[in-house]
Amino acid sequence: MSCKAFQGQTLREHIEAMLAAWEIVKNKYIPSIIRVMKTVGVKFTEEDADKFMKTLIILHDVGKCSEVYQKHLSNNEPLRGFRHELVSAYYAYNILKDMFKDETIAFIGALVVMMHHEPILMGQIRSLDKEELTPEVVLDKLRTFNGVMEGTESFIKSMIKEKLGVIPKVPSPTQEDVLREVIRLSVLARHRPDSGKLRMVVGALLIPLVLCDYKGAKEREGESPKFAEVLRVEMMK
């Protein structure tokens, strides 16, 4: 399978570039990941934090393996509002739960993946607030989703085995599965008694993921002027 992340860059190439970026900055971010996860009762070792972030990197864009997204990249067919992050979050929740055997880790990881393009959604899904992520909104963002490309499951398994040495259970998402899971996660996020703390944790985890995502995209299209200085500073050893 050759799933594209962008025009001119396969998903594997994008993941590889992000993982390379993570290796450069991880010593800066692993301590903060351990600290923020501790606030929600998760005791990460350095190895756990590294494994968690690498899993997020591998899974954050797997929703782009959706048939609708690949047709958009290959044939310029319209996405009609489709958001790949929602499918990616479904994968992240199920795979993280299988790998870590912990509901909180899976829950938080899925939210991070769901929101990793939050700053650029421009009025589509800007937050986890009720008015932003209603069932109607989620359904609208998934109405053109009709499954993923053949080979997606084996791609995910091979990437995680190659990078982390484990073979996870990988679900086969239907539109109904993704819709139900995303709505459930968003409801839980809004109504937990520690929702304020949860926002802080998700925000802290988004920083290294988004940084590596920009770095991975830079390998394809070059630095954007506004982000170039941030990249130069953060990627310094």
From Swiss-Prot:
- UniProt-listed CDD domains: Cas3''_I
One Pfam family from the UniProt entry? Cas3_HD
Instruction: List positions binding Mg(2+).
Output: 61, 84, 116-117
Superkingdom is Archaea
Quote the record's activity regulation.
Answer: Both ssDNase and ssRNase are inhibited by EDTA.
For the protein in the UniProt heading, the enzyme class is hydrolase
- What is stated about pH in the biophysicochemical properties? Optimum pH is 7-8.
Domain HD Cas3-type, residue spans = 4-215
Q: Which GO terms describe its molecular function?
A: endonuclease activity; exonuclease activity; metal ion binding
This protein's UniProt keywords? Antiviral defense, Endonuclease, Exonuclease, Hydrolase, Magnesium, Metal-binding, Nuclease
What the entry lists under InterPro entries is as follows:
CRISPR-assoc_Cas3_HD (IPR006483), CRISPR-assoc_Cas3_HD_sf (IPR038257)
Some GO term, biological process aspect, for this entry: which one?
defense response to virus
Which prosthetic group or cofactor does it need? Mg(2+)
Cofactor: binding comment:
ssDNase activity requires Mg(2+), ssRNase activity does not require cations.
* This enzyme's EC code(s): 3.1.-.-
The yes or no answer to whether the keyword Metal-binding is present is: yes
Note what the entry says on domains: Proteins of this family have an N-terminal nuclease domain and a C-terminal helicase/ATPase domain. In some CRISPR/Cas systems the domains are swapped, in others they are encoded separately.
Q: How does it assemble?
A: Monomer.
What family does the database annotate? Answer: Belongs to the CRISPR-associated nuclease Cas3-HD family.
Q: What does it do? A: CRISPR (clustered regularly interspaced short palindromic repeat), is an adaptive immune system that provides protection against mobile genetic elements (viruses, transposable elements and conjugative plasmids). CRISPR clusters contain sequences complementary to antecedent mobile elements and target invading nucleic acids. CRISPR clusters are transcribed and processed into CRISPR RNA (crRNA). Cas3 plus Cascade participate in CRISPR interference, the third stage of CRISPR immunity. Acts as a ssDNA and ssRNA nuclease, probably with both exo- and endonuclease activities.
| Protein name, UniProt field | CRISPR-associated endonuclease Cas3-HD
The protein's organism comes out as Pyrococcus furiosus (strain ATCC 43587 / DSM 3638 / JCM 8422 / Vc1)
